[in-house]
């Protein structure tokens, strides 16, 4: 009898060991679902369309408001307007229309894209409609947004639209290769916030460490 019990235990031992090993070390990891990208919406709640034009509107009121526009940079020798500015008040003129050029077919939050002022212009000034980030401005101690970029250029012309922590959206500058050229790109994704600085009495879009510009997008 004892011999039969002993043989039975020997038969069951591999099953117990296999079961323990499988459950503790070889659990099957099911693939997790990727988050569904969220489309960026305009002021009417419609998804942004790469073929449409929009005004970038600051959410603030009074001196905190004002649309984004294309203007001449102070002391610039460029043959065309080459600066990205914000009007000094929400009761000022309407901003310059822009279009968003995504890497994919749609415009989603937290996705790389180019931004271009969508206005009639002479051939000489076509490249002066595409947004980019300039070199470090020693006087203002920041990097200013300007035009003269190239669609698809990774190091100076890529931006993202992300949800603001307050209301509306924020713009981010996100170079994807030479991060060392952007001392303001400090977050996990090597992006920098876009805000406003004062340059010669005008409000100029620039990279900031805090207080990013909260904006909405109004279809033209």
Swiss-Prot record:
Superkingdom of source: Eukaryota
A GO term from the CC aspect: vacuole
Keyword annotations of the record: Aspartic protease inhibitor, Disulfide bond, Glycoprotein, Protease inhibitor, Serine protease inhibitor, Signal, Vacuole
GO molecular function, a single term: serine-type endopeptidase inhibitor activity
Secretion signal, residue range per the UniProt entry: 1-23
Residues under site feature: Reactive bond for chymotrypsin: 143-144
Disulfide-bond pairs as recorded: 80-125, 174-185
The keyword Signal is annotated on this UniProt entry: yes
Claim: Heme is one of the keywords in the record: no
Role: Inhibitor of cathepsin D (aspartic protease). May also inhibit trypsin and chymotrypsin (serine proteases). Protects the plant by inhibiting proteases of invading organisms.
Protein name listed in UniProt: Aspartic protease inhibitor 5
């Amino acid at each position: 009898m004892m011999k039969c019990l002993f043989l039975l235990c020997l038969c069951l031992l591999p099953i117990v060991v296999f079961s323990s090993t499988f459950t503790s070390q070889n659990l099957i990891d099911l693939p997790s679902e990727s988050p569904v990208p969220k489309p960026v919406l305009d002021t009417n709640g419609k998804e942004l369309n790469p073929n449409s034009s929009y005004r970038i509107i600051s959410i603030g009121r009074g001196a905190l408001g004002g649309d984004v526009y294309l203007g001449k940079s102070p002391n610039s020798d460029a043959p065309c307007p080459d600066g990205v500015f914000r009007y000094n008040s929400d009761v000022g003129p309407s901003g310059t229309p822009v279009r968003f050029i995504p890497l994919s077919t749609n415009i989603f939050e937290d996705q790389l894209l180019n931004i271009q002022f969508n206005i009639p212009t002479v051939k000489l000034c076509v490249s002066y409609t595409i947004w980019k980030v300039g070199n470090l401005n020693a006087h203002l101690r920041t990097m200013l947004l300007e035009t003269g970029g190239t669609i698809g250029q990774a190091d100076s012309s890529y931006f993202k639209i992300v949800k603001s922590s307050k209301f509306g959206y924020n713009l981010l500058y996100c170079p994807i290769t030479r991060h060392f050229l952007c001392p303001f790109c400090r977050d996990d994704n090597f992006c920098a916030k876009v805000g406003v600085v004062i340059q010669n009495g005008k409000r100029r879009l620039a990279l900031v460490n805090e207080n990013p510009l909260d904006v909405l997008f109004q279809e033209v």
